[in-house]
């Protein structure tokens, strides 16, 4: 059975392909920033935000593809319960890295499987991360190295 991946993440697609899971990608096109703002206003913590985003994406695509299994996923970075968003510029990326530099933070990832527009399974887990202490020069070198991928990752760095 071919599952639907409700994600534009190339990494998630590669993982499914690596394990020979027959899949097709249908992007949910939900406004993640709007959803995050709403959840934060309601007092949601980063775990709940990650879970809800995965579920919303999965359910949206699932409702348009009845009787198909849809996999939605989301990951966020949390530093002292503060959600770290994707940067919009290199300057913002540098500021985020400075904030994470030499500090403990968490990668929170959620996965949701939906069918007929409703969640049938979900899981959320976290990994504790600590970036070693880097100089401004080392941070700039890193940003130069990852180039346009700067804007694709929460927390700016890529651990996949």
Question: Language model features by range: what are they?
Answer:
Residues 1-69, 82-83, 137, 141, ...:
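N-terminal polybasic phosphate/anion-binding patch
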Residues 75-77, 107-114, 157:
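Short beta-strand scaffold segments in enzyme catalytic cores
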Residues 2-3, 68-69, 105-106, 110, ...:
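Structural motif
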Residues 35-39, 78, 118-125:
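Acidic/polar active-site rim loop that often engages polyanionic ligands
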Residues 75-105, 131-133:
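Active-site-adjacent loop/tail segments of enzyme domains
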Residues 124-160:
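Active-site oxyanion/phosphate-handling segment shared across diverse enzymes
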Residues 72:
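Generic enzyme active-site microenvironment
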Residues 96-98, 110-127:
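Anionic-ligand binding region
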